[in-house]
């Protein structure tokens, strides 16, 4: 099946290579959704003097306004105007005639210019003129039959509502339907598109985010796990965390390519632990990326220096990169594409995500996707033998609710480290235990976790404790336990 590339970043991936040649496709959406931008971007990226694009406007607005609109974007090419990209306005005549006469007018323009790509914006204006659904259906059949015979790919742009998909006859006749949306969630607006229909062609289903910038539209495909597991050979190699005493709790380190969740209350040491994991990996020659949503690179670098790491040298040698994104403006699909791109460019073997809770803000338009996103992200790391560490905040200090189960993050991670506060001898100390190490040995001991700028991080002695040590206030003398 021959295709016409859209040349819109990542859209051709969703369309399995582009728009099928000689097909007729509707681009639908509410005003402001980005339909006209998308149509123009496709036109200017494909048009040549031999393969012309004809853009027919039905808006009865001056063509100069249409052209000024296109000039706002980087894809506009003045050299193509008039000989490769041709504009025609039938808006004024549209008010004088019926839908059938307008179809004839479009066909006359197509015969005159012989385009390879035809865009009618807005096509819905023609449907509004039709005296009956049956008459409009016949006119569409006539238009599509003619365009198919002359090998012309057609984009029909219209301000359709979602319910029109089931009411308007054109949707059942055309070969493809691409629906664009722009909706507000809280104080943010989210743009997305999805393929409703693509006759005789595969495509990536679901809702895909996109943004509009000076460059035009960029699409961020919905990040999912492949339907069939990728074939890869799991590693048996153990990699060091570099934290004194922690590797021993895992029987010599964590397994390469696995994911480790570090969960704990605020200040328990999650970020410091994750940073040590990454920087100690750099000491061993493993490149890594720190993906942060709370601590910016300046703060992380300060923490690293306080613990004696030569972070300037490590970064200058390309061993570690910090990638900070504000959770307020986060879109998870856009973000993971950037993370994967940075991983590939650095050839990273370790990744830290601090913290997974902040990713929920990026899933605001679809909270059900949060779990699916985390799962897909971890699987991607695993498929590429990237050892990852994720952090998650627990809200209850000294309280219960230790483990996130079911569809929680701990269900996805291979290893789980729990950091808690305990009270011993009138002091608040930190406790660490390994709750889980999938498919391998781990200690079940509860140990003191020492964080010191002089000593670094260290897993200390066993904590003498009652069996409720991790869920209640703990004292050195179990007889003094207060529940």
What are the functions of these language-model segments?
Residues 25, 100-173, 177, 330-416, ...:
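P-loop NTPase motor core
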Residues 241, 247-267, 272, 280, ...:
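Flexible loop/N-cap segments at domain edges
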Residues 49-130, 286-365, 369-372:
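Conserved inter-motif catalytic segment of the P-loop NTP-binding fold
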Residues 22, 49-52, 82-85, 150-152, ...:
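Short glycine-/polar-rich loops that comprise or flank the Walker A/P-loop
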Residues 25, 54-56, 86-88, 155, ...:
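Hydrophobic/aromatic beta-strand patches that form the interior of the parallel beta-sheet core
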Residues 15-76, 249-311, 412:
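Walker A/P-loop NTP-binding active-site region of P-loop NTPases
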Residues 59-63, 91-96, 124-126, 154, ...:
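Conserved nucleotide-binding/hydrolysis micro-motifs of P-loop NTPases
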Residues 1-2, 111-113, 182-240, 244, ...:
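Conserved P-loop NTPase
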């Amino acid at each position: 099946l021959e295709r016409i590339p859209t040349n819109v970043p990542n859209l051709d991936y969703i369309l399995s290579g582009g728009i099928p040649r000689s097909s007729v496709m509707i681009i639908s959406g509410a005003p402001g959704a980005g339909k006209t931008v998308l149509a123009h971007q496709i036109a200017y990226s494909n048009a040549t003097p031999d393969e012309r694009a004809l853009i027919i406007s039905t808006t009865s607005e001056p063509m100069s306004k249409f052209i000024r609109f296109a000039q706002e974007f980087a894809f506009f090419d003045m050299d193509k105007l008039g000989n490769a990209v041709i504009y025609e306005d039938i808006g004024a005549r549209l008010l004088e005639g019926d839908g059938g006469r307008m179809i004839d007018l479009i066909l006359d323009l197509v015969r005159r210019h012989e385009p390879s790509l035809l865009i009618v914006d807005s096509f819905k204006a023609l449907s509004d003129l039709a005296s009956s659904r049956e008459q409009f259906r016949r006119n569409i059949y006539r238009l599509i039959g003619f365009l198919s015979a002359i090998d012309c790919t057609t984009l029909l742009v219209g301000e359709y509502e979602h319910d029109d998909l089931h009411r308007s006859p054109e949707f059942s006749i055309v070969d493809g339907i691409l629906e664009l949306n722009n909706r507000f969630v809280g104080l943010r607006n989210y743009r997305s598109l999805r393929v409703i229909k693509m006759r005789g062609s595969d495509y990536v289903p679901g809702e895909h985010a996109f943004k509009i910038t000076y460059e035009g539209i960029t699409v961020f495909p919905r990040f999912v796990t492949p339907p069939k597991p990728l074939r890869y050979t799991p590693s048996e190699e153990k990699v060091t965390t570099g934290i004194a005493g922690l590797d021993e709790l895992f029987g010599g380190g964590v397994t390469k390519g696995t994911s480790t969740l570090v969960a704990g209350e605020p200040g328990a040491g999650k970020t410091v632990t994750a940073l040590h994991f990454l920087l100690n990996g750099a000491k061993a020659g493993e490149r890594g990326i720190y993906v942060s949503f709370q601590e910016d690179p300046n703060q992380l670098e300060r923490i690293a220096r306080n613990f004696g790491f030569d972070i300037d040298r490590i970064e200058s040698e390309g061993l570690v990169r910090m990638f900070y994104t504000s959770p307020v403006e986060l879109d998870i699909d856009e973000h993971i594409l950037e993370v994967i791109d940075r991983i590939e460019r650095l050839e990273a073997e370790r990744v830290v995500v601090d913290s997974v809770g902040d990713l929920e803000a990026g899933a605001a338009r679809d909270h059900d996707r949060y779990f699916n996103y985390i799962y897909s992200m971890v699987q991607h790391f695993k498929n590429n033998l990237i050892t990852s560490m994720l952090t998650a905040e627990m809200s209850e200090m000294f309280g219960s609710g230790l483990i996130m189960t079911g569809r929680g993050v701990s269900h996805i991670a291979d290893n789980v480290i729990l950091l808690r506060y305990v009270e011993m001898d009138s002091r608040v100390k930190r406790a660490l235990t390994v709750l889980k190490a999938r498919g391998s040995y781990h200690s079940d001991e509860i140990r003191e976790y020492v964080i010191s700028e002089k000593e670094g991080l260290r897993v200390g002695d066993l904590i003498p404790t009652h069996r409720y040590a991790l869920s209640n206030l703990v004292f050195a003398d179990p007889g003094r336990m207060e529940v």
